[in-house]
Regions:
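Small-residue helix-packing motif on alpha-helices
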Residues: 30, 40, 60, 197-204, ...
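Hydrophobic packing residues within well-ordered alpha-helices of enzyme cores
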Residues: 15, 19, 40-43, 79-83, ...
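Internal alpha-helical scaffold of NAD(P)-dependent oxidoreductase catalytic cores
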Residues: 104-114, 130-168, 179-220, 263
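NAD(P)+-binding Rossmann beta1-loop-alpha1 motif at the extreme N-terminus of oxidoreductases
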Residues: 1-62, 66, 192-194
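Rossmann-like NAD(P)(H) cofactor-binding subdomain of soluble oxidoreductases
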Residues: 31, 47, 57-133, 137
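NAD(P)-dependent Rossmann-like dehydrogenase/reductase catalytic/cofactor-binding core
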Residues: 206-275
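Short pre-catalytic strand/loop immediately N-terminal to key active-site residues, enriched for Gly-Thr
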Residues: 165-171, 223-228
Length: 275
């Protein structure tokens, strides 16, 4: 069983590295095509002497059982039309490009139906991501399982029954890391304003976020229960949360996430147009 990556950028490199580290695939089972010499050099270092790395999909010895489209959204149409469309037979095609709908990819691939679309996030670059995925009905169970193996190389995977929900996934987990980075920034700034040294404030904010996430990830208690456990009646945490409530922070946050979802839908309309 072999895989081919069309695009060898950061996310493709993370997946290749994860697959090799977990011994899910050998280097000689992985093919990568990317016109950028620097990207090819990085992938080649990962694969060492195994697999094949080329400048064009036309030069690959084969496509394997799964083709991963790992190019930027703006380059997706060209990647599909130039060399790939004419080589596809029964392979499954997995797109990790944000915003590009499967209707557009199918059109650029001359009606190819075995398509999977997913939305990873940046923590995937360190193997700690989560990916939302949707598979069209023509994708076989074996092909879906193969896609799952690939995506699990960089974190967890959740499958959706409706492609349109990927816009919500993008708003929650795709953009989500930025929300948490912003919150860390604010907590750090608040600590500095209270007299803490910047380095100390940053370390406190980051480790608190990390520890809280680990507690929540255990799944034994809901985030609400964990919050209530920290919040003593008349205490310091309650004083802070009362300010959040007065300022309607929760409602504003939900509006922000909804705005991200709306923009994702708009970008799908824009990016899916033929050049």
């Amino acid at each position: 069983m072999k895989l081919s990556f069309i695009g060898g950028g950061n996310m493709a490199q993370a997946m290749v590295g994860g697959l090799l580290a977990k011994k899910s695939f050998r280097a000689d089972q992985i093919f990568v095509a990317d016109p950028d010499a620097k990207a090819r050099a990085k992938v080649s270092r990962l694969l060492k002497r195994g697999g094949q790395v080329s400048a064009s999909v036309r030069d690959l010895r084969g496509l394997g059982s799964l083709v991963i489209l790992a190019v930027k959204p703006q380059a997706m149409e060209a990647a599909c039309r130039e060399g790939l469309a004419d080589r596809l037979r029964g392979e499954a095609v997995l797109s990790i490009a944000a915003g590009i709908r499967l209707d557009s990819i199918s059109r650029w691939l001359k009606g190819h139906a075995r398509l999977i679309r997913c939305m990873p996030n940046t923590p995937a670059l360190i193997g700690a991501g989560i990916t939302g995925a949707f598979a069209r009905p023509a994708v076989s169970r074996a092909q879906r399982n193969l896609a799952q193996r690939v995506l699990q190389s960089v974190g967890k995977v959740v499958w959706l029954d409706d492609e349109a929900l990927l816009d919500a996934v993008t708003a929650v987990s795709g953009s989500g890391p930025a929300y948490f980075f912003w919150l860390i920034e604010q907590l750090e700034a608040a600590g500095v304003a209270l007299g803490l040294a910047p380095g100390v404030a940053r370390e406190l904010a980051i480790q608190t976020a990390l520890g809280a996430a680990k507690l929540a990830a255990r799944g034994k208690d809901s985030p609400a229960s964990l919050r209530e456990r920290v919040t003593s009646k008349g205490g310091t945490t309650e004083a802070a949360l009362e300010v959040f409530a007065r300022e309607a922070l929760g409602e504003r946050f939900r509006k922000a996430v909804a705005a991200a979802r709306t923009r994702g839908t708009e970008l799908g309309d824009i990016l899916g147009k033929d050049a």
